[in-house]
Amino acid sequence: MKLSDVQKRLQAPFPAHAVAWKPGVITKDRSRALMLAHIDARNVQDRLDAVCPDAWSFEVEVVPGTRLPTVKGRLTVLGVSREDIGEAPEGDLGTLKAAASDALKRCAVQFGIGRYLYDLPKQWVAWNDAKREPVSPPELPEWARPDHERSPGGAHLVQAMDQLRYEMPEDLELQREVYKHLKAALGSLHPISGGNQGRAA
């Protein structure tokens, strides 16, 4: 088994309940916040265990002389290694363990795990500053959900977006394929009446 054989499974969206949200920016009046989606290091480990349980490893090396606990992580999946730096947050959570978790998530993104979260649209929501949480959590768009959580048209929309991710295909048949999926997605939202239904008698 090669990395290319499991790439799509590694890159697959996580269930909505596994995606957490944290404020990236809060307005001066503390009434609204720009929410950022993220996953836990355990989600990364679970994904790796599900896809290639005996073919991945993670190593960390402490980076000396930094203000916050910092490590260099190396994630190896099916013989391919990716490295990145992990840094612990400020405050009580600033531990080497937190830095290692950060490094694991950053390395995992290089394999496509959770990378789609960086493509989410900006989501500003009402912010409850007393509770330090959003009044209502943001909603994930259709394409950022696993198949079983999508609406009937969601799968078609994802197919079209996959083909348009980099550029509009020049091949006429591929253009027709994109159009077919977009039409099916829109049709699921606004079903087209069949036959003479809706016509004047």
UniProtKB/Swiss-Prot annotation:
InterPro entries: Rad52_fam. GO terms for molecular function: DNA binding. One of its GO terms (biological process) is DNA repair. ssDNA-binding protein that contributes to the ionizing radiation resistance of D.deserti. Plays a role in DNA repair and genome reconstitution, in a RecA-independent process, since DdrA is essential for recovery from severe genomic fragmentation as a result of exposure to severe levels of ionizing radiation in an environment lacking nutrients. In vitro, binds to the 3'-ends of single-stranded DNA, and probably protects them from nuclease degradation. Thus, DdrA is part of a DNA end-protection system that helps to preserve genome integrity following irradiation or desiccation. The truncated form (1-160) of DdrA forms heptameric rings that can assemble into a 3-ring structure. Belongs to the RAD52 family. This is Single-stranded DNA-binding protein DdrA.
